[in-house]
């Protein structure tokens, strides 16, 4: 799957809380050996916090859950700065509608970034009114507690103020269903 994605376009990846030991960040995560074995020039994997200047106009800012002490604000505000983060943000919602009032961080961590692309929460949702900070959700229904409207998001970002987002739903041929 990872190789197939990287064959299509540059792939930027960060690990999440299930990919390693958050209490021992120096321990090997589950993704690094896979990335090393693939040895693909189009895969950019970042376990540590920092910036990845993808183009002259675009910077990905990694806010790693394994390296929170080294989070930084954007260093070039002329670029489009996109924060990448895998974790819960206060007031995000789960598939069953439960609001996580106390996430690992507040939405304010993204205030200096132009956009925020998030992972961890499986329900697709925007966390701000403008739609700049989003969870795309998961690509497949994981269990009976999740809805079946899974898929992925497509951002089209022309500049800091002109962007669109759309959710593309994937057909699940074998959904979890409950018969009462």
Task: Report each predicted region and the residues it spans.
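Accessory, non-catalytic peripheral segments of nucleic-acid enzymes
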Residues: 157-180
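Binuclear metal-dependent hydrolase catalytic cores centered on His/Asp/Glu-rich metal-binding motifs
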Residues: 54-108
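Short, active-site-adjacent cap segments at secondary-structure transitions
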Residues: 19-22, 53, 90-91, 124-125
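Short, conserved active-site loop motifs that form the nucleotide-linked donor/cofactor pocket
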Residues: 43-44, 58, 114, 133
């Amino acid at each position: 799957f990872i190789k197939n994605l990287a064959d299509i376009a540059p792939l930027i990846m960060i690990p999440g809380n299930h990919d390693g030991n958050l209490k021992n960040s120096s321990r090997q995560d589950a993704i690094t050996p896979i990335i090393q074995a693939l040895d693909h020039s189009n895969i950019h994997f970042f376990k540590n916090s920092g910036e990845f200047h993808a183009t002259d106009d675009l910077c990905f800012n990694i806010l790693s859950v394994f390296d929170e002490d080294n989070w930084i604000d954007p260093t070039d505000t002329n670029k489009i700065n996109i924060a990448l983060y895998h974790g819960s943000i206060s007031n995000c919602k789960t598939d069953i509608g439960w609001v996580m009032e106390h996430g690992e961080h507040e939405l304010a961590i993204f205030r200096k970034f132009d956009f925020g692309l998030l992972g961890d929460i499986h329900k697709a949702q925007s966390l701000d009114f403008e739609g700049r900070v989003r969870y795309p959700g998961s690509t497949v229904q994981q269990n009976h507690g999740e809805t079946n409207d899974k898929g992925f998001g497509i951002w089209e970002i022309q500049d800091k103020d002109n962007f669109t987002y759309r959710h593309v739903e994937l057909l699940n041929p074998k959904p979890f269903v409950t018969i009462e």
